[in-house]
A protein has these predicted regions:
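Outer-membrane beta-barrel "beta-signal"
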Residues: 177-185, 246, 290-305
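Transmembrane beta-strands of outer-membrane beta-barrel pores
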Residues: 40-48, 81-89, 123-129, 163-169, ...
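Transmembrane beta-barrel domains of bacterial outer-membrane proteins
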Residues: 37-138, 142-146, 233-241, 296-304
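Solvent-exposed loop/turn segments connecting transmembrane beta-strands
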Residues: 47-52, 137-139, 165-175, 190-201, ...
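Outer-membrane beta-barrel translocator/channel fold
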Residues: 81-101, 195-282, 286-297
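Bacterial Sec-dependent N-terminal signal peptides
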Residues: 1-40, 305
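Surface-exposed extracellular loop regions of Gram-negative outer-membrane beta-barrel proteins
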Residues: 147-150, 160-164, 171-176
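Repeated loop/turn-to-beta-strand initiation elements of outer-membrane beta-barrel proteins
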Residues: 38, 67-72, 113-117, 155-160, ...
């Protein structure tokens, strides 16, 4: 499979590194690729007119491979960013817009004979309005960091676990994160998640160079930082999406992934940004959001160099 790319939001190979099988060091819910990538995705849900757009960019700025390494490990510096804009029909007492922005600097390198480690630092912005003017330092801007250790079981499987550091509550907090990835021949499977942003997983098969198909499960979480009754709060929205994701390759660099499925459950809750209550209860007296299953459709474009 030289110079091929197999997607379910997963694998990439670049021309100069045909012997490097892959790099699945997951930071938050984004993979790190060995080649530059730009992707755009639009999500449409059947109820409440929910519409979401997402733009992601990742650019490796320095990349080295290890000669004769049995686990195809690499050393890489990369910069990345992600933008999510979400909007639905207005509901009294609940945010109907959400803007999540992030930017990170990442470094991955081998450790010992069969390990790698990943570090990252960056910023995250979580606002209840899709306007850049709604960004306010001290209100909805937080610092992010990560440290993950990755065990390369063999050439087909790797497992990673570590911590995310986030100033969600106004001071550094540590949250767990983990992933597992497997690839053998045309088959691939992966799962990843963390406390703050939920999780995703997929099982897929590449039928031919221009076509692959995955079964995708997505329980991602989106956040909006705001004031509720004069107190600092965060509004979380979580989906439970299951669907089929066909991916069509057009030419050398372009991929068109689709997802057709159902949002089995969508809920939204307020949490006060205070340690004593954040993990145990919702914001007292605040409304909650809950919807029955709805159709889900997503279309995207990926450009990989």
């Amino acid at each position: 499979m030289k110079n091929t790319i197999f997607y379910c939001n997963t694998l990439s190979k670049s021309k100069g590194f045909d012997k490097v099988h892959k790099l699945f060091a997951w930071l938050y819910l984004l993979p790190i690729f060995v080649s530059a990538q730009v992707s755009f995705k639009t999500d449409i849900l059947g109820k409440e007119g929910l519409f979401r757009e997402e733009l992601s960019l990742q650019l490796p700025i320095h990349l080295d491979s290890l000669a004769k390494d049995p686990y195809k490990r690499i050393s890489v510096w990369a910069v990345g960013g992600n933008m999510v804009f979400q909007q639905m029909n207005p509901t009294e007492g609940l945010p109907y817009q959400t803007m999540n922005l992030s930017a990170n600097i990442l470094h991955l390198r081998p450790l010992g004979t069969r390990w790698s480690w990943l570090t990252a630092v960056g910023l995250g912005i979580y606002t209840p309005e899709n306007r850049l003017s709604s960004i306010a330092i001290g209100e909805n801007v937080v610092a992010n960091g990560a440290l993950l250790f990755i065990w390369h079981s063999n050439q087909h499987m790797q497992i990673g676990a570590g911590i995310l550091v986030n100033t969600l509550l106004g001071y550094p907090m540590v949250f767990p994160t983990a992933f597992v990835e497997y690839q053998a021949g045309q088959w691939i499977g992966w799962a990843k998640g963390n406390f703050l942003e939920g999780g995703k997983g997929a099982i897929g098969y590449r039928f031919s160079e221009p076509f692959s198909l995955c079964l995708l499960a997505d329980a991602s979480i989106y956040a909006a930082f705001l004031r509720k009754e004069g107190k600092k709060a965060v509004f979380f929205t979580q989906h439970t999406i299951v669907g089929l994701q066909p991916d069509f390759r057009v030419g050398k660099y372009l991929h068109i992934p689709l997802v057709i499925g159902a949002d089995l459950m969508r809920m939204g809750i307020y949490k006060e940004r205070k340690l004593s209550t954040f993990f145990t209860q919702t914001f007292e007296g605040a409304p909650k959001q809950s919807y029955s299953p709805a159709l889900y459709f997503s279309v995207g474009i990926k450009i990989v160099n």
